[in-house]
Amino acid sequence: MDRAVSQVALENDEREAKNTWRLIFRIAILLLTVVTLATSVASLVYSMGASTPSDLVGIPTRISRAEEKITSALGSNQDVVDRIYKQVALESPLALLNTETTIMNAITSLSYQINGAANNSGWGAPIHDPDFIGGIGKELIVDDASDVTSFYPSAFQEHLNFIPAPTTGSGCTRIPSFDMSATHYCYTHNVILSGCRDHSHSHQYLALGVLRTTATGRIFFSTLRSISLDDTQNRKSCSVSATPLGCDMLCSKVTETEEEDYNSAVPTLMAHGRLGFDGQYHEKDLDVTTLFEDWVANYPGVGGGSFIDGRVWFSVYGGLKPNSPSDTVQEGKYVIYKRYNDTCPDEQDYQIRMAKSSYKPGRFGGKRIQQAILSIKVSTSLGEDPVLTVPPNTVTLMGAEGRILTVGTSHFLYQRGSSYFSPALLYPMTVSNKTATLHSPYTFNAFTRPGSIPCQASARCPNSCVTGVYTDPYPLIFYRNHTLRGVFGTMLDSEQARLNPTSAVFDSTSRSRITRVSSSSTKAAYTTSTCFKVVKTNKTYCLSIAEISNTLFGEFRIVPLLVEILKNDGVREARSG
């Protein structure tokens, strides 16, 4: 009994002890809370004593300023990020791609030479300075928004003249042809010793070179190989093209006047030649009796050719034999191109009749004057596998001198305005299976040529005539989808006479401010233009090789006119130069 009572008493003591400790804990917590609260009140009182209401009002302003600084810093960092992205994601890959393209072109050229070493095709393929890598044969200005004519040529720049000039009063240098690839350029012109109208004998100057930059950054055209073809062959109307084996050239060989040639019954002799990198020239006559079986006269287009898909492509033109298969298939075919905002007032039936007659001008005995394109396989064997394409006259005007151009992945045929249509024409060209197809042309209404009435510069109606002058445009400005927007060229700014050589940038309807060679009375003739970029400086240049009158030494002097393409927003046209 006593033991049970003791056990109960012990449990009561333990319970009482627990309650005591709980009370002590609660009191301690309460005291700690009171102390903390007192400390907080004291701190708040101190803080209120140190800060006034005006101080509190300024806090949002300071926060806003801090926010602006942070935003500005972040924006600056974003600019850096954007520049890094542009460099890494856009510019560097493009530069690498351009470098790769040039290296591949050089390797291709070297491969051709190695394969043909046994045939003395030459060694040591030249190449432009690195500053030009990715700046030749490319879409130089890609711009969807700017006015095309806000781009304009600078004044002509002094540079090394790479073109020989006449050395006597009776000497004549004429008919320049130029083409430039990613590795080298090719140039040729005709030389007559006794005046420009002599058709009986001439020799041909042919040169191969590269673009260089001087220590001060100036551009010069460095001639590495050249030859004067002064033999018994009278080469005329030559076109040149830069290929992986050197400078390929297509010439006709004539001993009679142009009119006499068109009145003959057989095609004109034609030869495919090449100036190799070793400075040696080789040539082979083409089998014109087969290739031009339906022709009585056939000439290269004078303008440069183009190397495409392992073949060299040249513009050609001439007269078809009446009632031959090639002549018959074109019977009744015609095309009428119209001036911008200047409609021909003649009746439609009359326009069609005159358009059809324009292909058979009386000057050449009523022969159909036809446009064509000749492609030849580029190999160590000259004249290999020639293929002639004759486009339908539902696309092309009367046959005339021309040029094949490649810019980026696009190909074009320029056709001289020898017929009634004065504005410059560039036909888009596609190639497949050794042949070419031409499409409806780009026209440049302000890029005209002088001509005899009724086919003068302002002419707007179809007529039969043989007139005009060779002044090719070079594709310069493109949309991002690779559609052509604008060209550069040197036109003869005159209604009827070959006067006033004038350089400008042209869109489909108008032109930029201009640069004149000299006064409006300056005589001139053929011009051929090519543009390129110095990638290191991102500056675009255009070269116009122009026949300019030369009263002391020869009738004409061929001058390489060099301009930089500048940009000036809001200026449509201004006289300069």
From Swiss-Prot:
Glycans are attached at residues 119, 341, 433, 481, 538. It comes from Newcastle disease virus (strain Beaudette C/45). It comes from the Viruses. One of its GO terms (biological process) is virion attachment to host cell. Homotetramer; composed of disulfide-linked homodimers. Interacts with F protein trimer. Interacts with host CG-1B; this interaction inhibits viral adsorption and replication rather than internalization. Keywords: Disulfide bond, Glycoprotein, Hemagglutinin, Host cell membrane, Host membrane, Host-virus interaction, Hydrolase, Membrane, Signal-anchor, Transmembrane, Transmembrane helix, Viral attachment to host cell, Viral envelope protein, Virion, Virus entry into host cell. Its main location: virion. It is an enzyme of class 3 (hydrolase). It is a single-pass type II membrane protein. It holds the Pfam family HN. GO terms for molecular function: exo-alpha-sialidase activity; host cell surface receptor binding. InterPro entries: Hemagglutn-neuramid, Hemagglutn/HN, Sialidase_sf. This is Hemagglutinin-neuraminidase. The gene is HN. The chain crosses the membrane at residues 27-48. Residues 1-26 are intravirion. GO terms for cellular component: host cell plasma membrane; membrane; viral envelope; virion membrane.
